[in-house]
Regions:
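RNase H-like (RuvC/DEDD) metal-dependent nuclease/polynucleotide-processing core
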Residues: 2-8, 12-294
Length: 294
C-alpha cells in the first residue's frame, strides 16, 4: 500500500505575466480512478503564487512532481557559476540567490537574474547573444552545461536542454529559474527530494521530466507530446490507469500533467528510482535529480 494518498503533477511555465495558460496541475489518487485536472482559481490560468500556496497547504501525503529543473549544473565545474564569487555552495543557496536578485520582478518572474551583470554571463539569451561563460573552457559541444541527472535522462531516450539555455521552444531555463524562486519561498514547508532526504511520512516535492513519463507510457518517436485524447488514453492504459473523458484534441500542458500524475502513481514504489547510481550526496545537495532518471 502506498504511503502517498495523492500524486500531483505540475506542468510549469516561466513566461511573463500574472497568469499562465501553460501551467497545468493534475491529480491521481492512490485509491484509483483516472487522473483529473485541477481547475485554476481564475479562467485566465494559474498564478505561480497560487501553485506555491497549494503546495504549502497540502493536507494529505502527496508526491508532487514539478516539470522544471530544481538545480543548475555544478558537478562539471565544482560550482554553479565558476569565476563568480557569489556562486552558492548548494541548491538552497542557489534558490535564495535567484530570489534575492529577482526581488523586483513580479509574479515570481526571473528577469532580474538573467539580466544581472554577472548572472547573465552564464546564459544563452538569443541567437548570437551568448554569455561569455555559457560554455566551459574546452567544451566539446555548443549545447551548454548539463547536470548529472540530464546525462541519465538521455538513457531514457529523451534529449534534455541545458538549464542555462533561454532560447527556443524546448528551453527550460526560464521555467526552472521561476520554479527555484517558488521553491525558495516554499521554505522547507514540504521537503524537496533529493536536496532534502526522503521523509518517512508526509508530502514531498520532486523534479520530473514529462518526456520521461511519456516514454514509459509508450509514446515513441522523436516527439513526446500527446495532443489527442485518444493518444493520451492509450498512454494511460499502458500505465495501468483508467481513461479520462474527452475526444479530439487536448493541449499538451494538460496531457503532460495528466499522464505524469498517472505515471507517478504507477512507478513511485520502484526503489531503484529513488536510488539512481549517479546520485551522490554532492549531486543531491547541489544539482538535485530528476525522479525517474536512471
Amino acid at each position: 500500500m502506498s504511503r502517498f494518498a495523492h500524486f500531483l503533477a505540475v506542468d510549469w511555465s516561466g513566461a511573463k505575466g500574472p497568469r499562465q495558460k501553460g501551467i497545468a496541475l493534475a491529480l491521481a489518487k492512490a485509491a484509483g480512478g483516472p487522473p483529473v485536472l485541477l481547475a485554476p482559481p481564475d479562467p485566465k490560468g494559474w498564478a505561480r503564487a497560487e501553485v506555491l500556496a497549494l503546495l504549502a497547504g497540502l493536507e494529505v501525503p502527496t508526491l508532487v512532481g514539478l516539470d522544471l529543473g530544481i538545480g543548475l549544473p555544478f558537478a562539471d565545474a565544482g560550482a554553479f557559476f565558476p569565476g563568480w564569487d557569489a556562486s552558492p555552495a548548494d541548491a538552497r543557496g542557489l534558490w535564495a540567490l535567484i530570489d534575492a536578485l529577482c526581488a523586483g520582478d513580479p509574479h515570481l518572474e526571473a528577469g532580474g537574474f538573467v539580466s544581472h551583470p554577472e548572472g547573465s554571463r552564464y546564459f544563452r539569451h538569443g541567437k548570437g547573444l551568448e554569455g561569455d561563460r555559457f560554455l566551459l573552457p574546452g567544451a566539446s559541444t555548443r549545447e551548454g552545461r548539463f547536470r548529472v541527472a540530464e546525462a541519465a535522462q538521455r538513457t531514457a531516450g529523451v534529449r534534455p536542454v541545458s538549464n542555462f539555455n533561454l532560447v527556443g521552444a524546448a528551453q527550460v531555463g526560464k521555467s526552472s529559474l521561476t520554479g527555484m524562486r517558488m521553491l525558495h519561498r516554499l521554505g522547507g514547508a514540504v521537503p524537496v527530494w533529493p536536496v532534502d532526504p526522503l521523509p518517512e511520512q508526509g508530502s514531498v516535492v520532486t523534479e520530473i521530466y514529462t518526456s520521461v513519463a511519456a516514454r514509459l507510457g509508450g509514446v515513441t518517436g522523436t516527439a513526446t507530446k500527446v495532443r489527442t485524447y485518444a493518444a493520451l488514453n492509450d498512454a494511460l492504459d499502458t500505465l495501468g490507469s483508467p481513461p479520462v473523458k474527452g475526444t479530439g484534441a487536448i493541449d499538451d500542458h494538460s496531457s503532460d500533467a495528466l499522464l505524469t500524475a498517472a505515471w507517478l502513481r504507477r512507478v513511485h514504489t520502484e526503489r531503484d528510482l529513488w536510488h539512481p547510481p549517479a546520485l551522490t550526496p554532492m549531486v543531491a545537495r547541489t544539482e538535485g535529480w530528476t525522479f525517474g532518471a536512471f
